[in-house]
Structure formats: C-alpha cells, structure tokens
Amino acid sequence: MTRLPLSRRRFMATSAGAALIAGASGLASPLRAAEPIKTAGIYTVPVEQQWVSRIHKAALTAQERGDVEYVYSENVSNTDYARVMREYAEQGYKLIIGEVFAVEQEAREVAADYPDIAFLMGSSFKQDEALANFAVFDNYIQDASYLSGIIAGAMTKSANIGMVGGFPIPEVNRLMHAFMAGAREMNPEIKFQVSFIGSWFDPPKAKETAFAMIEGGADMLYAERFGVSDAAKEKGVLAIGNVIDTQADYPETVVASAIWHFEPTLDAAIAAVNAGTFTAADYGVYSFMKEGGSSLAPLGTFEGKVPEAAMALVAEREAAIKAGTFSVEINDEEPKSS
C-alpha cells in the first residue's frame, strides 16, 4: 500500500470511567485525568475499511469527550509500520493504537524502546508480561456472529452459504466458526463454501469470489470483506454483514450484521493510562457481548421477515450470553468448506 503523510486531526475529550487492572504496576508518571492523552492511530488500510473504521470511530468518540488528542496515519505499508510507530513515539504521543498482525515482532521491538509509552495493538498473539507497555486486543465478536448465523440458517433456502474472508487468521476464523455454529442450529445439514482472498481490502476480488459461490449454489453470503454484499445485491441473494452495519447501503440484501464496538476496549485503555496502571494485558475481553463490545444490528428492512422460531432462539441465546449462562465456542482454527 502507498504510505500517506501523517494526518494530524486533533480532537478533545473527557475522562473514561474506572481504571483497568486497578493496582497493577503500570507506566510511570500517570497523566492528569483532565489532560487529553496524545493518541495516535496507525492503520495499514483506509479508515473506511470496516475493521479499522470501528477503532477510528471509538477514537473520534473519545476525542469528542476530551479524553484524547487524536491523530492517525492510514494506508501504512507493513514495511513502514515500525518507522511510523517510532515517529509518533518521538513526537511525544502517550498512547499508540493500531493493528500489527503482519508486523508482530517489529512492533514489539519498537515498544521495547519506549517503555513510557502505552501501545494497544490488534494482534493474533497474547500479551508478554516482559513487555509491560504493550497490550493486545482483537475483535472477539463471536457472540454476535453466532446470533447472525442463526438468522442466516433460517433464511437460506438452498441450505448453501458462501463465506468470503480476508486471511485465515484467528480473528477471522473464530467469527466464521461462530457464524457456522449458529446457522447449524437451524439446519445441521447446511453446506458452507469458504474462501479467503489474501487481502484486507480488495472489494473487486471479494466480489468475484462471491460470484463463484453464488454460481455454486449459495443463496446466502457471509460478508467478512467489502465487495461480498455487492455481489449478493447484483445476483439477488442475501448477505450477513460483519463488524459494521451496511444495511442502509443494501436494504434488500443485508439481513443482519454482527457489530463490533471498540469503545469499551479503548475506554479501558484510556482509563488505565490516566491511572498509571496501563500494563501488558489482553483487552480482547472488552469485545465480548456481555462487556458491550459487540451486538446484533437491528433487522431494519428485514423486520418481520425472519422466521419467528429463529428470532425466538436469537432472543433466548442473546439473554443467556449476556447473563453468562451460554458461551459461544472460540475456535481459531481455519474453517473449511463442507
């Protein structure tokens, strides 16, 4: 990807709630709660891309409250990522957020050189206690994905669902498996076509892959990537959204969406930085539905069109998930076509 110049879009915010990991040893010299935290986002894709857009949205919300002064760089290549991290660190930013799935080691090496700066990074790996200023997160929205799968299983007539993903990494795999488990609640014999396009942002390729699945009999698509819902719309089949709600753009196509809310994750990090307790931790828990980190989007134009039995099961399971009496399996293995 082409590296863009550092964008400086500043925003102001207020304090975020109780601190994460109270009493834990964290970064030295905590900032005053009233002082906005200088925060930088580093993204390898445009901020319009669905996954990154949720991080960006949460940062914008925090800036509006006065919690942070926020700037960001988008379309940063993997080869430039560590350099951009260093640039922000040298400029005095106190909280750096982003996604390091392709630069895991390099990002940690940078963080080790700046022990007084908090790094909160999307990662396929867990935290390392030896690197106290580097916390990780991921979009553990398997709860909402499972519920959207129940709806998909009830709406497919061909019992054939196409699933297009970016890469077969844990944060994608677990959502696909949860979706498949939900669909099988309605029909254990559903067939799944699974494919990965090898890119986080290539709508034309995702669209062509989806077309092939429709030709293979799929009448319902799982849109893990942009471009899939376009194919569904053109061919007159249905789709389930992922991470963001795109029904406004596809009112006759997208039945439901599993939504990721990054606000609980970022707010916990902001509180920890303010309290001086930020340390190596796995912030992935804040994406769980019971933490407010994920939800099922309203059915909107499909209200009343999903079979009642499916919606009754969705309501039952959603209540149980929030109460902690039902757990959706987290399966990070690569899903396969059936």
Where are these regions (language model features)?
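Short beta-strand elements at the ligand-binding edges of bilobed clamshell
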Residues: D128-I151, M163-P168, P251-P264
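Periplasmic-binding protein-like
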Residues: Y93-V100, L120-G122, G216-F226, N242
